[in-house]
Regions:
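Helical element adjacent to the flavin cofactor pocket in flavoenzyme catalytic cores
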Residues: 190-253, 257-261
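FAD-binding beta-loop-beta segment adjacent to the flavin cofactor pocket
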Residues: 187, 326-330, 382-409, 413-416
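Glycine-rich FAD pyrophosphate-binding loop
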Residues: 23-47
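Mid-domain catalytic core of redox enzymes
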Residues: 85, 235-369, 397, 445-449
């Protein structure tokens, strides 16, 4: 009996994880990606001799599936993962504050950092520590938590505006791509419990030391080709048909393709366009997931102004800033990447407008930047970086299985229980692959019997 043929539509992290899982299980895999590259929302480009990422991506030690993908690709040596959580927080005119992992067991390991977080008054720090203790008891799978925002919940507990917009935003905005006031409490609890509170080492921060294309797309392409997968770039799927009692039919460049299974691993808006009603997926709900942007600012300076790998901001429009000098291939000076999540306010601003806001903010935050000469300043924008992780989205996210035989969904927008992160994307791809392989094994066993 020949190996089953599985088609994966989409070459982002979800699609790559699904394709590798299927190929490793012995399936014949074909991957179709509309763009000329793999990697999805994690990609690199050249700009005036610099190699830069579209945006800064980090992961945490708790991201088991993502770390497993790095191991499968053989690129674990291309990332840095902290031995112990240590996040420097800069605010104008103040010394650095630190969020560090202490020696106490979880969740008390962060108590000293929260109580010593000097950008907030002491009373606000105590309230934040008490809120963290309460969050550690909440169930992220409780549907009631998805009906309220983290900000509203914190306000009901007496948290100040400074604490909500400063400390709590710092902890969840980069992960949920939403400010704390607009983020689903359920997803925030997932982030805070899994990432910070349940395990003492869970929040140790990791990042790539190389451009993202060298971390994901290039090694994944090589691994898939070694596994015998067929890769088709610049190949858009024109239509998807679900037929009663049969596997799906794809139409690509006018040709019909009838694999044993299809894993639809594109973004949720593309999935909503492709999915027929017979798939049993609520495409109105998919469209209602919306989109949330990320804007990244790239600043090239004639000297070093940041002597840390990264720093978070408090009381400044700068959210997170990373030293990308080595990864960019620059030998002198410094390249900074400033990541702005939930960036609705910045998405439509021109490069000049962003420069006028963020260069003074950079100088206010890092005194050394006041004397530095700006050699270049440019932006990369992801208008649909993630779905909008607001209250009410839990019910909109579909499972990996559909009601159509042989059709499965993957993507960070599916019902993984995780937010729209690299970890969520990889988990979704693996779940879809496991479901497809399990169904094919059952189907073939029935045929053999």
């Amino acid at each position: 009996m020949s190996a089953p043929h599985i088609v994966v539509v989409g070459g982002g992290l979800a699609g790559l994880a699904a394709a590798l899982e299927c190929a490793d299980a012995g399936a014949r895999v074909s991957l179709f990606e509309a763009r000329p590259r793999l990697g999805g929302a994690t990609w690199s480009t050249s700009h005036r001799g610099l190699e830069v990422d579209n945006g800064q991506h980090v992961f945490l030690r708790c991201c088991d599936a993502y770390l497993g993908l790095l191991d499968r690709l053989g690129v674990h040596d291309r990332v840095t993962l902290q031995d112990r959580l240590a996040v420097p927080v800069a605010s104008p005119g103040r010394p650095l504050a630190w969020i560090r992992r202490g020696a106490l067991p979880a969740p008390a390991h962060l108590a000293r950092s929260l109580l010593g977080f000097h950008p907030l008054p002491f009373a606000a720090r105590v309230r934040a520590a008490l809120s963290a203790r309460r969050i550690a008891t909440l169930d992220p799978d409780d549907p009631a938590l998805d009906r309220v925002s983290l900000g509203d919940w914190l306000q009901l507990r007496g948290e100040s505006d400074a604490a909500i917009d400063g400390l709590w935003d710092l902890l969840v905005r980069a992960t949920l791509n939403q400010p704390a006031r607009e983020a689903s409490l359920a997803l925030a609890v997932k982030v805070l419990r899994t990432g910070f509170l349940d395990r003492a080492d869970a929040a140790d921060v990791g990042w790539s030391r190389v451009p993202l294309s060298r971390l994901h797309a290039e090694p994944a392409e090589a691994a898939l080709r070694r596994a015998g997968a067929a890769l088709h770039l610049r190949a858009s799927v024109d239509a998807l048909e679900c037929r009663a009692g049969q596997s799906p039919l794809l139409r690509i460049r006018g040709a019909a393709l009838e694999p044993d299974a299809v894993i639809l691993a594109c973004d949720h808006e593309s999935a909503a366009r492709l999915l027929p009603g017979s798939a049993g997926v609520d495409t109105v709900a998919l469209r209602a997931l919306g989109r949330s942007p990320i804007v990244n600012l790239h600043v090239v300076l004639d000297r070093r102004v940041l002597e840390l790998p990264f720093v978070a901001g408090f009381g400044t429009p700068l959210q997170w800033m990373f030293d990308r000098t080595q990864a960019s291939g620059v030998e002198r000076g410094q390249v900074l990447a400033i990541s702005l999540s939930g960036a609705d306010a910045w998405l439509g601003r021109s490069n000049a407008e962003l420069r006028d806001v963020f260069l003074p903010a950079l100088a206010a935050l890092l005194p050394a930047a006041r004397e530095a000469r700006v050699l270049d300043f440019f932006t990369t924008r992801e208008p649909a970086a993630t779905f909008r992780q607001a209250p009410g989205t839990r019910a909109l996210r579909p499972p990996s299985r559909t009601s159509a035989p042989g059709l499965f969904l993957a993507g960070a927008w599916t019902a993984t229980g995780w937010p729209a992160t690299m970890e969520g994307a990889v988990r979704s791809g693996r779940a879809a692959a496991e479901a497809a392989l399990a169904d094919l094994r059952v189907s073939r066993a029935r045929e053999a019997a």
